[in-house]
Each structure stands twice: as C-alpha cells, then as structure tokens.
Amino acid sequence: MWRTEDGGTSWSAVRGSPGGDDYQRIWIHPTDPNLILAVSDQGAVVSSNRGESWSNWYTQPTAAVYHVTTDNAFPYRVCSGQQDSGSICVASRSDDGEITFHDWHPANIQEYGIAAPDPRDPEVVFGSARRGVSRYDRRTGQTAQVGPDSAARGEKFGRNVRTMPLIWSPVNPNVLYYTSNVVWKSVDRAHTWTRISPDLARQTWTVPASAGRYASSVTPAPRGAITALSPSPKSGAVLWAGTDDGNIQVTTDGGATWKNVTPAAIKPWTRIFNIEAGHFDARTAYAAANTLRIDDMHPHFWRTHDDGRTWTEINHGIADNAVANSIREDPRVPGLLYAATDAQVWVSLDDGANWQSLRLNMPAISVRDIQVKDDSTCVCADLVAGTHGRGFWILDGLTPIRQLARSRGRAGTYVVTPQTAVRVRFGTNEPTPWPPELPAAQNPAAGAIIDYALAANAAGSVKLEIVDASGRLIRSYSSDDPVLDPDPALDPASYDRVCQKNPGAADCGLPLYWPAPQQRLATHAGLHRFRWDTRYQPIGDNPRTGEVEATGAVPHRSERTPVTPWAAPGRYTVRLTVEGKSYTQPLTLRLDPRVKTPPAGLRQLAALSREMYDLAAASHAAYLQARARVDSLSGAARAQVESLAPAAPARAPRALARPGQPAPATPPTLESASRAALAAAMAMQDADVAPTAAQVAACTRARAQVNAVLARWRRLEPPPRRSRRR
C-alpha cells in the first residue's frame, strides 16, 4: 500500500509484506483523513492515524482456501493452502475449550496448494505446488522439495496450473499421486516418481461463445492440466482424472491404459473441480464440473455407475446461479452424497436424484471443497468444508443424516444409533481463560451425542437414560428437569434483572457471557440432539449442581463444575421413553486415544472411582432415609439419628463435593462421609492415569468413614414394618 501527500509526485510504501498483501480496496473518510479502511486478500484493517498503525485482520474468519484435507492425528487437523496468508493446519478440537492460535500452524504449502498429510505420520504434511511437491515435518520445522523434476519442463514434467492434485492411495498408504497434465506416482513416499499416464488434456480447443466480441483476438494458450484425481477405495488399479479443459479420463489397470469417458455435454473450458471414486464399487464415480469460465452459472454434477460409459447429470433441487465445486460420497451409506457450490453445501439421500440444503448455520459463501472425515483414527463422522472467504467449517456427527438415508426419510419416533463417544475433557486450561474479544473457533461438544426423533409432540415428559452392560442405570435425564428460567446464556438481559433482585442466584456472580446454554430434552415433534457428559448421575435432588467451571472456561460455552466421576469406557444402552414406550440403541464409550496409561492403572482408576461414587451415593441415600424418619422419633433415639443426619443448611441439597475438597472435620455424619467419598473420587478425575499413593490413601480413609457411619445407621435404623398375618 502506497501513500502520496503531494498529488502523486512522490510515493511512500506504508503497509505490506515482502510477498505482497494483495490490497484490493481503500476507503478514506471524506471529512476525516485519519480514518482509513483497507481490504486485502487477508481481510479488512482500519487505521485511525493516517496509516501509521492498523488494526489486526486476524479478528475476522476470512481465510480463502482452495481445497480441504484432514490428517490422522487425534484430534484430527484440517489443512489447506490459503490465499495470500500462508497455509493452515488447524486442530478440529482443542484441549483449551476453544480453538485458538495455539492450535494451528502453517505447513509450508503454497497458497493454492493441496495438503496431503502422511496417513502413517500426521506430523508430516506433503503439499502440491506449481514447482512440484513439498514435504513439511513439524518435528524439525523443515520443508523439502520432493516432487518430480519440475526443473525439466515440457514433455518430461508437463504443464500445471495453480491447484495441482496431490492424493494418497486409499488402499496403499505408501502410494502418493501428483499431477501436471500427466499423472505421477510414487511408491516410496515421494522419494522417486514414475509417470503413469499420457497427456490427459484435450488435444485441441475452440474459443467459447462466451468470449463474445473478443473471440477473434483470443490466441492459443498451452493445453490444459489435470485438476482432479481420485484413486478408487475399492481397487488400486482404478484412477479417475479430470482436467481444467473439460476432460474426464479413467484407468482400470493402474495407468497402463487410459480411456476418455467425458460426457458429451461437458464443453471445452469446463473445469473438472473434483472427481469422487465410488466407495462401494470400482465402476462408480461422481464429478463436479465448474463452468464459470464459459459464463454458465448453473451447477453441473455428474454420476456414472459403469466405468464412465454413461453419465447422468444430477442437479435436481440444487439452487441455480452457483457453479459446482465439489461432490463426495458418504463412505458408510451407499447413495448418500454431499455437494458444494459457490453458495453452500447440499445433501442427497438418493444418489443425486434429489438434493436438499445442508447449509444450516453456514454463511452464504463459495464452498470450494468438502471431505467426509470418518475413520478409526478420528472416532468421528464429520463433514468438513473449506470455503473461499470464511475459513473451515465442520458439521459434527453425520449419524442422523445417515439414518435418514438408510430409511429413505422414514417418519416415526426413534433414537439414532450414536457414533462411538470419546471420553475427552472439554477444556483443561487453568484460569484465566482467553477473553471473549480474542478470536477463537468453537470446540465440538464433549461427551456422547444422542440424536432422537419424535413423530409428534409428546403428551407427557420425555425421559432419556444411560444403562451399562449389567443393566445398571448410570444417568437419567427428563424433560421435567429444572432449569434456570430465563436462560442466562440465551437471554442475559432478562437474567440480569433476576440477579438485580436476587444477587445470590446461580451465575449472578460473573458476567453472563460465560455460561453455556442449558440442555433440556425436547418434547416437540422433530429431530433433536442431546449430550450425555459421560459422567455418573449427580448425587442429590438437583441435577444443576456445580457452578460455572473456571478451568476450561470458554465465553458463551462454559460448563458447570463436574460433581461426579467419569463413566468407565465400555458398552452402554441409550433408552428413550416417550408416552410409556421405550426406544433403545447401543452406545460405545472409548477412552481418549492419546492416553497411554497401562491397562492395570486404568482398571484401578475405574474401580476406585466407581467404588467411591457408590459409597457416596449409599451414604447420601441413608442420610435421606434418616431425615425422613427423624420427625417420627423422640428422645435419645432422635438425638442419635440427628447426630448422624443433621438438618441440612437452607440451600441444601447442593453439590456434595468439589474436586480437591477436603473431608469435613469430625464427628462424621452420613453427609460428611458422602462428601469425603465423592471428594476422593473427584480428586482422581483430572487425568486418565493410575491413582497416586495419596489418592489411594484418601480412598481408604473415605471407605472407612462411610462404612463406619453406615454401620451406625444400620444399628439405629428401625426395622421395616411387617404386615400381621390374619
């Protein structure tokens, strides 16, 4: 960016990087020249002092990416080059409760390049570029050039354009493909390359009608290059290729021979943005044909089930005036397709015969690429989108869409089979958290995601239960569970008035931009999502125990301090009860894959946590029994019971323990013993590691205390009345 103050006689550079920031527009306030707004490929910046200093464009999610890929780390990273801002590899989940600058790092890919993370080593990221292929290693921070000999242009290397495909074989993790106008293959992780195709672009081309009056001045340019490549997940011998001049070619023998299978309706100058080889048979493929360059703004998606011999255009339901960019097939459900245009994302449940919007809360933006992330490394089922101007977006949990596709949209009340849940901590950062004015992206929800559908409005309450493999109830939710009204997260202004009248009410001691919206089971017709936090049932009458958690606090998403231990990894059953009828589905809970604690230590942790929880629950149940009977007693008997179960303070029942809370002083009571056991359990919940000697000792003390007070209670407890025999 340049500035002149003498009518253009002299100029001074005032802003920009050595590589150029690509400024597009500048606006100067007509009456206050100190105020300047500028926009570039990176975002918008503001100066209030004639350009001496500027605001930060990193306050805006304006990344313009060309493609999107994911790696096999846990949590997985989302990677791409981006327009004039360096490449990106950003975690899809953060241990800090929200995704911040701590969670991303460049991978040294050119701005328009395609990232190809090593499937066997997520610390290594390969990237495509005009000059070839790069290899970035996070451990060393170094980048090597490892592509075919790009110095030898012409016939040997071939032609290329800005976004050259670079993709790993889905059937052989050692095989990597790269393209120019020919396909290159490496079987040794980019150490050596072999050319496996002829020139796959059109041999001739004509001037498109859209050139109009300029047609006579158009001069021949170099022929096209390959812009789409898709190896088959079913056969290592099948590859599909598409070019930026409208060719689609396929090989079924590993590149020995290629066949041009371009649909007749695809015109020259059409850019094949992507091809998706079928996941369920090697003869199927889908293609996104982008016709922007010939002034055709209609979407054009194609499908073949016979090796490309015949093609069907599949656009019904997709809005016009937005060209096709990407199409993907769900790897789990045949016929379930996702598509991206220059405006939004779409979904088809019937192999492209009909489409419906999947935009949801996304802005209207050019979605350049989409990927289905679903494998054993991520323990997920997500749809990842790369946009040209709004960065990355992730749709968490495709299971409801998959169920709709399998059932072809059947109606009724049901529970969607949950995807495997991973026991991760939402946020582990110690206070103070990042303030809300700093840019951050949302973490996915922690816990088990449970989707359910109601065919009609429920006549009564809706109940959701989690049952373990032995049939024991672990957690129970009801649509009648008490919640704060109004919700401080959703209506802070109204709740602030509550706080003015009652400063001691929940959440009134902190700004109301911290709490997360409350969960409540929905009772109206439709598809609903609920989350089990993968913990045991709170002990006490009020499920809203615990204040907003300081550790892991996130603006607008801060959870409450947990008051019960984690449920152990294993198999569970989700049971939904509506109007007396129950619907069940199995649920698997897994440990965080990053945990490497030996099994013996994990078993000890689970056993002690469960034992302490059970002791706390038993002691609290005895306390409730004692308080229920104390009014029927008098004299010494009443005094003895009250010594074990004194009346609770006015605000009880509350949370029985907080992590690290010490056991109360003697004399022990049923409630103090319950708190001691729960405190011993909660002290072990911060990490999936074997309990320390101090933690084991605390469990020993709590066990003895609970057993002692329960024994005293049993001696005092009146025997149950028996009916007299008549």
Show the residue positions of the predicted features.
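Beta-strand-rich binding/interaction modules
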Residues: 134-135, 450-451, 458-476, 571-575
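Low-complexity, Pro/Ser/Thr- and charge-rich linker/hinge segments at domain boundaries
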Residues: 399-426, 584-618
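Contiguous beta-strand segments within globular domains
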Residues: 428-463, 467, 525-531, 609, ...
